Amino acid sequence: MKKSARLRIDSKGKIYLDVFFEKTEKEKKIEGEIIGLDCGYKKLAIMSNGDTIGKELQAKIEKISRKVQKSKAFNRALIERNEYINKELKQLNLDTIKEIVIEDLNNVKHGTKGKIRKEFNNKLQRWVYCYFFNRLEQHCEVVGVQLHKVNPAYTSQTCFDCGDVHRSNRNGELFKCRSCGYTADADYNASLNILNRFRPQVHMVPVHKNQLEKCNIFL
């Protein structure tokens, strides 16, 4: 890996060390599992294989929202949030994963995730998605995992079990199909739809009991 460095001083007298390097992209995996991944408001991400990371995300976002924008405390909270996301990403076990399917952020609009209503919180959440997906993309490149994007339309309202689409199917963190009665964590159900949208020819069997236990859904 070729490296070079440059020391520079900005107009305010701050000193920066810029490090440049060329890296060789790791060969993509040809064997392994393909999973869907959905970002939530209370959880950073939940996967179609049942794994969940970032269960303290909501607390981090709410901490930022209480700070005065552009203040030192606000900036510290942002740094803390980013460090938390980086730490949680390291907990994501990709040893047996060859491909990850996520939503295309270009199609995500205000209020499509959870029940965030205030404009500032909407911005905070979009920042989280952008930062997380950028870091995830970098992480995948390092370990040779392919990343795919699909249209997110109605993934949170569609029943993975029977295909019924209706906004009443989702109530906060709980998904309960009005048509067939299928019940699951809402983000987990969305992760299955995301994966199925990438591989529509394969209809997987959702993990009912185990997934409800993993996501702490009490019915």
Predicted regions and their residues:
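Generic structural signal for short, flexible, solvent-exposed coil/loop and linker residues
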Residues: R6, I34-G36, F74, L89, ...
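A sequence-composition feature that detects small, non-aromatic residues
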Residues: A5, A45, A59, A73, ...
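Substrate-contacting helices/loops that form the catalytic groove of nucleic-acid
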Residues: S11-F133, Q201-L219
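Short amphipathic beta-strand and strand-loop transition segments with alternating hydrophobic
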Residues: K3-D10
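Low-complexity, intrinsically disordered Gly/Pro/Thr-rich segments
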Residues: K2-K3, C180
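Positively charged, low-complexity nucleic-acid-binding target-recognition regions
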Residues: T24, N121-K123, W127-L219
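Short low-complexity stretches enriched in small and charged residues
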Residues: M1-K2, E103
